[in-house]
């Protein structure tokens, strides 16, 4: 069984906003990071997102992101999203905006066709309940902490057994996202890059985090 590496990052701003972006070549990357957002936290930050926040959702797919060991490629081609993808993979994302945004910014760097990229994302999303195959990085964005072991315990139940690093940054401790790191084929777990783990370390040194309820 693959080890699960859980990082609790309590950032209000997205982790990847401070990572290094590069134009990149389609298909040239090191691994995938699949981001699963905890919808109640997203909606607490962006309540105007009616597509997502008008429904009682838990974990939702934010995206499947090609990654380098340092940084990540972005917008590798100018290929626009085929509207048919929204119909063929209905429900893959919680909002229509994400279909276009995720394909054009991240999917174009996968080296896959639109159908194959969305199929891979769909397959991996469905396998999130089988964490034994995955390496996970949890990110949280905070107000009333769970007990000292509550945060790690909650994340462990979400992600499965393994190694844990928990924490906060800028006093924000609500669970926001879980990152699942996989090889380029999406078949096996890989350890999230040293850069990713180091960047989350200031957040991940604390023993608890908060989890908003689904309403």
Curated annotation (Swiss-Prot):
GO biological process: RNA catabolic process
GO cellular component: cytoplasm; periplasmic space
Record-given protein name: Ribonuclease
EC numbers: 3.1.27.-
Similarity section: Belongs to the RNase T2 family.
Segments of this protein annotated with the region Disordered: 144-166
InterPro entries, alphabetized: RNase_T2-like, RNase_T2-like_sf, RNase_T2_His_AS_1, RNase_T2_His_AS_2
Compartment(s) where it occurs, according to its Swiss-Prot or TrEMBL record: Periplasm; Cytoplasm
Signal peptide range: 1-22
Residues the record marks as active site: 62, 102, 106
Entry function: One of the few RNases that cleave the phosphodiester bond between any two nucleotide. Shows a preference for adenylic acid.
Annotated keywords: Cytoplasm, Endonuclease, Hydrolase, Nuclease, Periplasm, Signal
A Pfam family the protein falls into: Ribonuclease_T2
Principal location listed in the UniProt entry: periplasm
């Amino acid at each position: 069984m693959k080890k699960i590496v859980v990082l609790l990052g309590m950032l209000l701003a997205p982790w990847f906003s401070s990572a290094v972006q590069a134009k990149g070549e389609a298909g040239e990357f090191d691994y995938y990071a699949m981001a699963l957002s905890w919808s109640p936290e997203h909606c607490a930050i962006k309540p105007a997102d009616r597509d997502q926040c008008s429904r009682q959702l838990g974990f939702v797919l934010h995206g499947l992101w090609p990654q380098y060991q340092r940084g990540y490629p972005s917008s590798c081609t100018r290929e626009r999203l085929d509207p048919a993808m929204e119909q063929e993979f209905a429900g893959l994302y919680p909002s229509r905006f994400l279909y276009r945004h995720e394909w054009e910014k991240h999917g174009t760097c996968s080296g896959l066709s639109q159908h194959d990229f969305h199929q891979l994302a769909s397959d991996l999303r469905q396998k999130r309940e089988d964490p034994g195959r995955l390496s996970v990085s949890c990110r949280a964005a905070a107000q009333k902490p769970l007990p000292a072991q509550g945060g790690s315990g909650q994340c462990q139940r979400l992600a499965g057994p393994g190694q844990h690093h928990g924490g906060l940054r800028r006093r924000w401790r609500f669970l926001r996202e879980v990152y699942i790191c996989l090889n380029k084929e999406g078949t096996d777990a890989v350890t999230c890059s040293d850069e990713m783990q180091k960047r989350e370390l200031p957040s991940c040194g604390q023993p608890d985090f908060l989890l908003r309820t689904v309403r």
